């Protein structure tokens, strides 16, 4: 019995001692979803005085992929509604990280991010678009044409992706996440601007893979020792 108690305490200690990892490259990202040879990073920056300020997930894909597609693949639950009418649900989808929920409003020109919530059981973080600020969209890596306000000439953004954060030069996106096509090594950041005041994207910490609950681990330990005792009886 003492052995079981000791092992259980070690399990609890191990869960609580997991350190946060600053993302220097894709190799530091812990939570990945999707499949394919290409890799991209999703960064959420809350700017809510909580820690960490900025968090990163990874997304694997092949063929064609978009910024909004990556966001929906990561979010555990996504709800798409009519603008200003949360009761009219147009679409729902399920992603990989059950700690994150996402609300998107669908306009004629495309989908617009409204709110993101993240709850890991320790802290709960929620930011909503157009109420106390807005989600600014920044990116790195890609190839697309765009127009600037008042400029009749089309401009081109053509920057190769990189798995290294030291290579990232954030660019305020002139296109929406629905139109943004990912490239291998691309980074997308949604940074909340409280009071509609923008701020620079800071180097993110890796979002951890959710651990099995303590109860499940302790149950496994108990079953293991019960079977061992029977075998030795």
Model-derived regions, located:
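Sec-dependent N-terminal signal peptides
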Residues: 4-13, 218-222
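Amphipathic, positively biased hydrophobic alpha-helical segments used for protein targeting
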Residues: 9-11, 196, 226
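Sec/Tat signal peptide C-region and signal peptidase I cleavage site
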Residues: 15-19
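Ubiquitin-like/PB1-type beta-grasp interaction modules and other compact soluble beta-rich domains
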Residues: 20-208
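A short, hydrophobic C-terminal helix/tail in secreted or cell-surface proteins
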Residues: 210-227
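Short, charged juxtamembrane terminal tails flanking transmembrane helices
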Residues: 230-233
């Amino acid at each position: 019995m003492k052995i079981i108690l000791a092992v259980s305490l070690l399990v609890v200690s191990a869960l609580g001692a997991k350190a946060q990892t600053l993302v220097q490259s894709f190799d530091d990202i812990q939570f990945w979803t999707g499949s394919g040879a290409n890799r991209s990073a999703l960064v959420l920056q809350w700017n809510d005085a909580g820690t960490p300020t900025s968090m990163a997930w990874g997304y694997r894909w092949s063929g064609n992929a978009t910024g909004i597609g990556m966001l929906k693949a990561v979010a555990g639950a996504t709800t798409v509604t009519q603008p200003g009418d949360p009761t009219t649900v147009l679409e729902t989808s399920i992603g990989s990280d059950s700690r994150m929920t996402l609300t998107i409003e669908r306009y004629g020109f495309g989908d617009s991010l409204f709110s993101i919530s993240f709850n890991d059981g320790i802290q709960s973080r929620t930011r909503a678009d157009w109420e106390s600020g807005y989600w600014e969209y920044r990116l790195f890596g890609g190839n697309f044409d765009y127009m600037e306000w008042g400029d009749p000439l089309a401009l081109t953004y053509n920057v190769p992706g990189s798995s290294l954060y030291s290579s990232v030069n954030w660019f305020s996106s002139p296109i929406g996440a629905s139109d943004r096509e990912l490239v291998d090594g691309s980074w997308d950041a949604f940074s909340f601007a409280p009071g509609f005041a923008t701020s620079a994207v800071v180097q993110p910490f890796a979002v951890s893979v959710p651990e099995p609950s303590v109860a499940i681990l302790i149950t496994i330990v108990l079953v293991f020792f019960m079977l061992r005792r029977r075998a030795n009886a």
